[in-house]
Amino acid sequence: MTARTDENMKSPLQAWVRALELTAPIERRATPTLPVLIEALAERFGAAPALLDRVTSLSYRELADKVNQYARWARAQALAPGEVVCLYMPNCPDYLAVWLGLTRAGVIVALLNTNLTGTALAHSINIVSPRYVIVAGVLLPAAWTARAHVPGSVRFVAHGGEAGDLPRIDTQIVELAATQLTADECPAPALDDRALYIYTSGTTGLPKAANVSHLRVMQWSHWFAGLMNTQPSDRMYDCLPLYHSVGGVVATGAVLVRGGSVVLREKFSAREFWPDIVQERCSLFQYIGELCRYLLAQPPHPDESRHTLRLCCGNGLRPDVWEPFQQRFHIPQILEYYAATEGSFSLYNCEGKPGAIGRIPPFLAHRTPVALVKFDDAQGQPVRDEAGLCIRCAVNEAGEAIGQISGAAGKHGGRFEGYADAAASEKKILRDVFAKGDAWYRTGDLMRKDAQGYFYFVDRVGDTYRWKGENVSTGEVTAAVTTCAGVVDAAVYGVSVPGADGRAGMAALVVESGFDLAAFRRELVERLPDYARPVFVRVVPTLELTGTFKLRKQDLALEGYDPTRVRDALYVEDRRTEAYVRLEESGYARLIGGQLRL
């Protein structure tokens, strides 16, 4: 354990103070934007590696030069400040150079999800009305599936690879000067100008484009730099998508603004993770909770005890994974946090309390007005009292987390920048909450807060279903299921059953070889009440995730438990024999016909 890590663990207060000190000038609008700051970083850190992957490395000087060239490319195309360019590229050092350069010229860059194709990709392009779409050569076949659904006025430009008839931006910039831009040549964008569109994950419905200002980019970068105490000696391992705020801004920006290096990987590999960490001498790792579970499921590897990681930072680390992950791999510090790209507030667990997503120190309470309000699952809305106002939750009572928006009724609050679609932005705002005229951002997440002020994630709104007259939390059921012997991963959701009120619980399981279904049920009987125990079980080889490692439970729920539609092994709980039995077509017909009671 390094002295710096030990200091962080002993005094979370120091982490908060560092974060406040680094972001104070940004709040006063006394700093440049990140693409402008890159030039100053290049002067200071020069040949030090900024971004690297398996084949390419960009020093700070080389990164700044490319930023200048991409900015000049934007000017050469007569792209005006506020116009949009979409970016459709896999993780690589040039990804950052492209969007930093274009935003240096005042262009807004929309970071497209590289898992999308066809009409879904076209939707993401069309909702931001771009002039150009920059496509990596390796992704051109995927991009062409959307082109017929995009207006002909939108120009496609290739980056690398076989471009066919398309111009290649990476060869065009070679002819452009790499020297520092002057204010006359290219006026710098303001902090409050929009820099990026970052899309919601699309776990339900089509993605929405969230507005991300230069101010937000700088705040995220410097706030996390303070909490993680990043230094020039740090090397961040970033295998999360660069099109998302966590992988693309937090993991990269927090290290770059302090002179460290970012080791990029196109995708996460549980098998290659520890050898990679050791070989690249990484000190930091940006995680999504599911990645930690995948690592725990791997057999022991010699490199898992040879690493030099001092801190892992991320979100979504489940309570049942936290301590086994930290203990097995000897992780000195875990910085778990809660945030949303478009959200008005964030929570941080600087103390490393297992299972908690964060807390708000008393000295910051006035800056971060957050509340948990009683929520009506049936109506899908917060509960209102006789005066029409929302009701705060008691200690350890689950409710929807909301954050007050700045400027509302003269109160302090967080900045809510919303989406490209104004109507979508309005849907996220809850009005007349505790006083007439106030406005709060709706997270859509149910949380509880304990007596010490720690927040705990409970469920997504809509992930609670009703069965046998009782409300069932998918989060609580998932926590019970994933601790059962032989279960590697699980998704829990509700499914409709003809003739039954509410929705029955169903669990999709990834299991180890030799999984004992009877023993699984016995464990659930001990841990869950009858109404919360999954009625249906589906054994799957893997769980499909979004590009940001969120479960696609909506697709599983739509597929349901019909053996003619689902090829995986399906089981239904037979209360008479007290066992999960195979659900075949004959049993399904009896169930649908009302002859098989649940």
Model-derived regions: residue spans:
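Structural core segment of the AMP-binding/adenylate-forming
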Residues: 1-6, 72, 76-77, 100, ...
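Conserved AMP-binding/adenylate-forming core of the ANL superfamily
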Residues: 28-30, 39, 47-92, 96-100, ...
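Conserved pre-ATP/AMP-binding loop-to-beta segment of ANL
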Residues: 47, 158, 179-199, 206, ...
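Conserved AMP-binding A3 loop
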Residues: 59-61, 195-219
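AMP-binding/adenylate-forming catalytic core of the ANL superfamily
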Residues: 116-119, 123, 133-135, 285, ...
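Conserved AMP-binding/adenylation subdomain of ANL enzymes
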Residues: 218-235, 243-283, 298
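Gly/Ser/Thr-rich phosphate-binding loop
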Residues: 279-287, 296-378, 415, 419
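AMP-binding/adenylate-forming catalytic domain of the ANL superfamily
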Residues: 528-551, 568-595
